[in-house]
């Protein structure tokens, strides 16, 4: 059975209160593609690794898509009305401004594919930690990996330069 069209503007107005930290992300459809509306602000320091492409459409406000491009950290600004297709396997960290709203479309993962979360040292860009996992639910599969990284001084300490990667305030207690 076909799903009726969604009035995206009406959906955003009805759910705007959910598009805020700490998650700021709501899946509106999932059938072959994962279609999400994402609100800002956010303060992500992780990089997402997806074996498929991701399509970004900035509806309101601005965002910066931080990417790791062949070992170099780079910023890609995406403004309201702009779209950007991120190629597969490019680690990326969406940084969304307060009040911003974006639409992100990813294809559902193939059975043999894994998603990843990576962290890089903000001082020297050395990869600190990477976790790969089969993605089942984008809203619930990420938080345990965030918890593991942010609660560990060992994982957050750069082996190259010794810098301690900062953790969000909600991770005030660490397990190491």
UniProtKB/Swiss-Prot annotation:
Entry keyword Oxidoreductase: yes
Annotated residues for binding of Fe cation 2: 121, 124, 158, 161
Organism domain of life: Bacteria
One GO biological process term: quinolinate biosynthetic process
Reactions performed catalytically: 3-hydroxyanthranilate + O2 = (2Z,4Z)-2-amino-3-carboxymuconate 6-semialdehyde
Record: residues binding O2: 44
Entry cofactors: Fe(2+)
One Pfam family per UniProt: 3-HAO
Pathway: Cofactor biosynthesis; NAD(+) biosynthesis; quinolinate from L-kynurenine: step 3/3
Gene Ontology MF terms: 3-hydroxyanthranilate 3,4-dioxygenase activity; ferrous iron binding
Record carries keyword Metal-binding: yes
Keywords: Dioxygenase, Iron, Metal-binding, Oxidoreductase, Pyridine nucleotide biosynthesis
UniProt remark on cofactor binding: Binds 2 Fe(2+) ions per subunit.
Positions that bind substrate: 54, 96, 106
Residues noted as binding Fe cation 1 in the record, renumbered to the chain: 48, 54, 92
InterPro entries from the UniProt entry: 3hydroanth_dOase, RmlC-like_jellyroll, RmlC_Cupin_sf
E.C. designation(s): 1.13.11.6
Record's function text: Catalyzes the oxidative ring opening of 3-hydroxyanthranilate to 2-amino-3-carboxymuconate semialdehyde, which spontaneously cyclizes to quinolinate.
Assembly behavior: Homodimer.
Cited HAMAP family: 3_HAO
Protein name, entry field: 3-hydroxyanthranilate 3,4-dioxygenase
Organism: Xanthomonas euvesicatoria pv. vesicatoria (strain 85-10)
